């Protein structure tokens, strides 16, 4: 996530999915707290519609996109989404512009779902890292130390 947000040549090809049939255990809260408070302006919570220019712009403007209540997509929708996840640049025609412009893909994706078998893709799901969770335990995070270690790595 950090490398994708700070280096134009890096794209995070993996979508983190937290799955649980248990409601209200903190899946969304966990994802929202992956970023320190100072960077939460770069967090978007939405499902990406590839035909919506505002949604595409979020991929170039956000550090993290929370696909809250991600309940799977049809085959065609999933293929389009997988393409968006791995696309190096996002081409957007800004309002009143004559031509599209290319913007670096800075966003990483994470999401929550309410059942384990959320993906129905016979070609494989290498882009999705699914974790089944039964409970969440929250600890106080020293974001300065965490991000210092990430930068060092």
How should these model regions be labeled?
Residues 1-60:
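P-loop NTPase catalytic core of nucleic-acid-dependent motor ATPases
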Residues 39, 78-102:
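Conserved catalytic/switch belt of AAA+ P-loop NTPases
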Residues 54-60, 94-112:
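AAA+/SF3 P-loop NTPase mechanochemical coupling elements
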Residues 61-63, 105-108, 123-129:
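Short glycine-/polar-rich loops that comprise or flank the Walker A/P-loop
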Residues 63-86, 119-124:
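Conserved AAA+/SF3 P-loop NTPase catalytic/coupling segment centered on the Walker-B
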Residues 113-118:
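Short, polar loop motifs at secondary-structure junctions
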Residues 119-138:
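A short helix-turn-beta junction within AAA+ P-loop NTPase domains corresponding to the substrate/partner-engaging
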Residues 132-153:
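C-terminal, non-catalytic macromolecule-binding modules
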């Amino acid at each position: 996530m950090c490398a994708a947000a700070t280096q134009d040549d890096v794209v995070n090809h993996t979508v983190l999915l937290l799955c649980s049939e248990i409601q209200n255990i903190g899946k969304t809260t966990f994802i929202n707290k992956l970023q320190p408070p100072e960077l939460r302006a770069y967090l978007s919570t939405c499902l990406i519609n590839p035909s919506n220019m505002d949604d595409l712009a979020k991929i170039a403007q956000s550090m993290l996109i929370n696909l809250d209540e991600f309940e799977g997509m049809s085959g065609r929708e999933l293929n389009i989404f997988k393409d968006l996840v791995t696309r190096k640049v996002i081409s957007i025609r800004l309002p009143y512009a004559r031509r599209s412009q290319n913007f670096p893909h800075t966003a990483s994706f994470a999401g929550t779902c309410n059942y384990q078998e959320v993906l129905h893709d016979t070609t494989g799901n290498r882009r999705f890292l699914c974790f089944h969770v039964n409970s969440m335990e929250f600890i106080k995070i020293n974001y300065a130390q965490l991000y210092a270690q990430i930068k060092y790595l």
